Amino acid sequence: MEPQDPVKREGRLTPVIVLATLIAAFGSSFQYGYNVATINSPSEFMKDFYNYTYYDRVGEYMNEFYLTLLWSVTVSMFPFGGFLGSLMVGPLVNNLGRKGTLLFNNIFSIVPALLMGFSDLAKSFEMIIVARVLVGICAGLSSNVVPMYLGELAPKNWRGALGVVPQLFITIGILVAQIFGLRSLLANEEGWPILLGLTGIPAVLQLLFLPFFPESPRYLLIQKKDEEAAKRALRRLRGWHDVDAEIEEILEEDRAEKAAGFISVLKLFKMRSLRWQVISIIVLMAGQQLSGVNAIYYYADQIYLSAGVKEDDVQYVTAGTGAVNVLITVCAIFVVELMGRRFLLLLGFSVCFTACCVLTGALAMQDVISWMPYVSIACVISYVIGHALGPSPIPALLVTEIFLQSSRPAAYMVAGTVHWLSNFTVGLVFPFIQVGLGAYSFVIFAVICFLTTVYIFLIIPETKSKTFIEINQIFIKMNKVPGVHPEKEELKEFPPSTARQ
């Protein structure tokens, strides 16, 4: 009898996959969202703390410029730390593994939680600034490693849904920070150190529970060359014993890029066979951050006030906007495998483009037409919905899908660097743009949304329900690499003698 091919099955959601996803996302992605929003509500109390601490040391209060500068540094240290964390992704995931990196990353959450929690007792605002760098590093690592880890755990028919879960927990983190940051809870003179210090709790829980779950089978098989460990991991993840078909698929990926070996960031940019993949992640990550999402939130309070919302009630409306963000991200989990990644990106950026255009007109005319502030509120909510559907969750998922194992860590380093530098740039530049252009500042974001939509329409293929090899073959045709067999797509860059080995 001829040997039969291994039986391929549709993957399913097992308790192991669900729990590993929830623990990784809560322990890591949640903190990213929490620390994005946690210093917004208590900012005035924290500035007072900075001032009183300075007075206790030198006998006089800070001038307005120095206080503003110190606060700007405090805020900007988070994206700066995120940038540093992105640079650490490649070395850590290659040496410690995906799960190992997430466990190591908890250091960058627990230590700053203690620093921020005890900063008031220690009378040191420097502890807060250092802590913001450290939680930024935590966010920079988690925003790249969690999607990579979950993407490599998931069966292909669930990869999209699980790939959106990290973004869901980011939005939940933002919402929880907004709720805890209500003035009646922790955004007050006594409560703000507790509000900042709570970020360490998810890290402690992840440190306790994640060790009981499998490492990425792809990492174990391709990089550690441990087939038995990979089989054990797959059996736990899939819930059945016969995993030979999936092992063979992973080995096929390994053979397809064996000659490539370790791919650095520099090598990533030089490889012709990865040209459109690299350009795509740069465009998507830059488009995600430069599309105006942070500016919308920055402007939201002013828009709510202009519509007649009382100043004390703005915090509740802001939390309501955060709840909408969570709800739509939950919807994205259920529709990403039905509608596909490409459709959600096109829909999301198109909604953001339309919202920015209408918001520009509404802000320009709100002093002339009485009901225009309500149009502005509708635009803010529409923008949040559009961004939560595609631009927020999908780019990180696509980085996992359009790169193979050897190039994935370097790709995440590039994606993370673009993400955090773009985030930092918007935070630094937007206040000046807003002063100079006023309502018309959103025209810039509308243009970026439009250009990103055009790029997605022309270049980005649909990746749902495809294996990593199948997706890579699509890009091989786009990159027009001559004479490369579909299973040797990344070998064009190497001498023939090497490729034949």
From Swiss-Prot:
The chain crosses the membrane at residues 19-39, 69-91, 99-119, 127-149, 162-182, 193-213, 278-298, 314-334, 343-363, 372-394, 413-433, 440-460. Gene3D superfamilies: MFS general substrate transporter like domains (1.20.1250.20). One of its GO terms (biological process) is D-glucose import. It catalyses: D-fructose(out) = D-fructose(in). Its main location: membrane. D-fructose binds at Y32, Q167, Q288, I296, Y297, Y298, H387, H419, W420. Residues 40-68, 120-126, 183-192, 299-313, 364-371, 434-439 are extracellular. Glycans are attached at N51. Keywords: Acetylation, Cell membrane, Glycoprotein, Membrane, Sugar transport, Transmembrane, Transmembrane helix, Transport. It is a multi-pass membrane protein. GO terms for cellular component: apical plasma membrane; plasma membrane; sarcolemma. It is found in: Apical cell membrane; Cell membrane; Cell membrane, Sarcolemma. GO terms for molecular function: D-glucose transmembrane transporter activity; fructose transmembrane transporter activity. Belongs to the major facilitator superfamily. Sugar transporter (TC 2.A.1.1) family. Glucose transporter subfamily. Functions as a fructose transporter that has only low activity with other monosaccharides. Can mediate the uptake of deoxyglucose, but with low efficiency. Essential for fructose uptake in the small intestine. Plays a role in the regulation of salt uptake and blood pressure in response to dietary fructose. Required for the development of high blood pressure in response to high dietary fructose intake. PANTHER family: SOLUTE CARRIER FAMILY 2, SOLUTE CARRIER FAMILY 2, FACILITATED GLUCOSE TRANSPORTER MEMBER 5. This is Solute carrier family 2, facilitated glucose transporter member 5. It comes from Ovis aries.
